[in-house]
């Protein structure tokens, strides 16, 4: 799929690079998995000659250094003498080199340095503090595990706390871009097709690309692709969140499945799970940024709180894939499709509301957008 959207982000990244010609810049780029962070960075800096891309694979530090040295030798056309086994030595070399030669350095999956060697973060802090005044480096670090990136840069006990000079959060595509993409692949698309693409992918770049590249451009085709045997989407929710949640993932999954199924108040969820949930809900909201709490518009007290899953893909995944996983395990995917078709209109009614809210936000014409409800129910305003 060709590159769509992200013009504001590209402009901002290019402005940051220009600023780095005067003084060192340290930018963190965050966003959920598959949101197109890497593609965005490569696109923004495709014309930058001295641009280095380091991917933090789950290897030993020595193996990573060999990969990084290969990239440096290829891009900078400079021989690196001797064997380098510590990332700190590479980082120090690049900061010192940037004092005479501007460099853009992208480090992808930055949080995985914690697995490789946690002391890398404190080494970077010391090297950065000693060299940043004279350096002309555009350092961009990118990460997908939100909770870890948050700890690394926003926990005041961590060595890199406060070192960033800027932050960019890559969000899903807005409605206008989703519409542009679908019309490119299916000029005769219907409103139902557009709503299905928004519902199943949430505008997440890689999910949209998978649908389009597979020729799934109608509502029916998208539903079939979403729940097909061995579909990427079936396993994605679990793969995406297990690393975030760790050993407690089953309890978090149960909470998210209940919220996705319409149990949106703490009381409703606790009455089903029979446990006290304030700690879990707080973490889901603040540490993982997966749910948000809502109160009725204009209400000033914290009453009538409802919780929602913010990510459309996870919302549909927990509503159908996780909830009916037993059907998938025995190959009853056609039965699952019947379940989805039966409740599709009701389910997507809320998604349609979210779509129009996203459109209003994108227009930048409104100062406040929210719903109103009381104990009797929600009013359509």
Range-by-range predicted roles:
Residues 2, 297, 303-381:
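A cross-kingdom feature that marks ATP-driven nucleic-acid transaction machinery
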Residues 2-15:
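N-terminal pre-P-loop "Q-motif" helix
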Residues 27-31, 112-116, 126-157:
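Sensor-1/coupling segment of RecA-like P-loop NTPase cores
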Residues 30-32, 52-63:
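A short hydrophobic beta-strand->loop->alpha-helix junction that borders the nucleotide-binding pocket
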Residues 40, 44:
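Hydrophobic positions on the alpha1 helix immediately C-terminal to the Walker A/P-loop
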Residues 49-52, 62-81, 95:
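Conserved NTP-binding/hydrolysis module of P-loop NTPases
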Residues 78-107, 112-115, 123, 127, ...:
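Mid-core helix/loop region of P-loop NTP-binding domains shared across ATPases and GTPases
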Residues 167-319:
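Interdomain hinge/linker elements that couple catalytic modules in large macromolecular machines
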